[in-house]
């Protein structure tokens, strides 16, 4: 499952090991259980959504030896304990939360994305963790549209990772919008056919599922590629979503 944590490749490229997990406000798990589950993956950064407020994220980090956490202030749809957070092995240089709410039928609000900039092996990476509403039928409204058109174009960091619960499948208009704005899903590099997999509902696998709605993207301008990754299949699910992970390798110079 890869070599170490934050260690350069022989060619000088920088591997960044990341994961995304919707923990359903911790209903079916504890932060300690989540930390133990993630241990084998030797992650650099984790993006959580539907995460409880307070020290929940930091407690996961305590298990993993990841000391730096940031929790946003906007809870999805104003529900209790549905925040977005970032857990990192390396210190943050900057953190911010961007609101993504829209006036649109069939859309819950508020929605947001949290961002942190950190250096992995001396190289700055901007990391976005989100939870947004499905917006399959529209190209110019919706949370994904605001993300792709208003937030990400302002990013100055050369290496960018965007992940979380998108509530959209690859091929949906919302996902196409993100990809056309210069982002690539790790599934494509890994040659994983997401139409044959699902990340929701992990607790009711026998029911009709929503397919893969949790994704990891990186900016194509960085010339990165995905070395490893996939959906983490748990015998005893810790949430209604499955966690997803990837090792993204960035060239030293984009």
Language-model features: where?
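N-terminal, active-site-proximal structural segment of metallo-dependent hydrolase catalytic domains
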Residues: 1-63, 76-81, 251-254
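Metal-dependent phosphoester-hydrolase catalytic domains
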Residues: 2-6, 152-160, 168-254
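Active-site-proximal beta-strand elements of phosphoester/diester hydrolases
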Residues: 15-25, 123-134
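Active-site metal-binding loops of divalent metal-dependent hydrolases
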Residues: 21-23, 50-51, 130-132, 165-166, ...
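Active-site environment of divalent metal-dependent phosphoester hydrolases
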Residues: 25-29, 53-56, 135-137, 167-173, ...
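Active-site neighborhood of phospho(di)ester-bond hydrolases with catalytic His/Asp-centered motifs
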Residues: 46-49, 71-73, 161-165, 185-189
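Structured beta-strand-rich core segments of catalytic domains in phosphoester-bond hydrolases
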Residues: 49-126, 132, 223, 228
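His/acidic metal-ligating clusters that form di-metal
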Residues: 115-128, 139-166, 174-176
């Amino acid at each position: 499952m890869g070599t170490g944590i934050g260690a350069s490749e022989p060619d000088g490229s920088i591997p960044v090991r990341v994961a995304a997990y919707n923990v359903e406000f911790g209903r079916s798990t504890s932060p300690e259980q989540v930390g133990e589950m993630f241990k084998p993956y030797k992650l650099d950064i984790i993006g959580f959504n539907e995460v409880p407020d307070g020290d929940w994220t930091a407690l996961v980090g305590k298990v993993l030896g990841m000391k730096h956490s940031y929790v946003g202030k906007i809870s999805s749809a104003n529900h209790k304990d549905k925040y977005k957070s970032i857990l990192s092995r390396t210190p943050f240089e900057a953190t911010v939360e961007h609101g993504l709410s829209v006036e649109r039928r069939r859309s819950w609000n508020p929605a947001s994305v949290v961002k942190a900039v950190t250096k992995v092996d001396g190289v700055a990476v901007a990391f976005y963790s989100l939870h947004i509403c499905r917006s399959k039928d529209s190209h110019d409204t919706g949370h994904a549209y605001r993300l792709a058109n208003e937030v990400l174009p302002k990013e100055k960091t050369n290496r960018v990772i965007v992940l979380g619960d998108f509530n959209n499948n690859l091929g949906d208009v919302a996902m196409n919008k993100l990809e056309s704005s210069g982002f690539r899903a790790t599934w494509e590099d890994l040659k994983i056919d997401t139409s044959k997999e699902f990340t929701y509902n992990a607790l009711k696998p026998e029911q009709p599922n929503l397919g893969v709605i949790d994704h990891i993207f990186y900016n194509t301008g960085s010339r990165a590629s995905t070395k490893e990754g996939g959906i983490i299949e748990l015998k005893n699910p810790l949430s209604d979503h499955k966690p997803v992970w990837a090792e993204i390798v960035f060239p030293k110079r984009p």
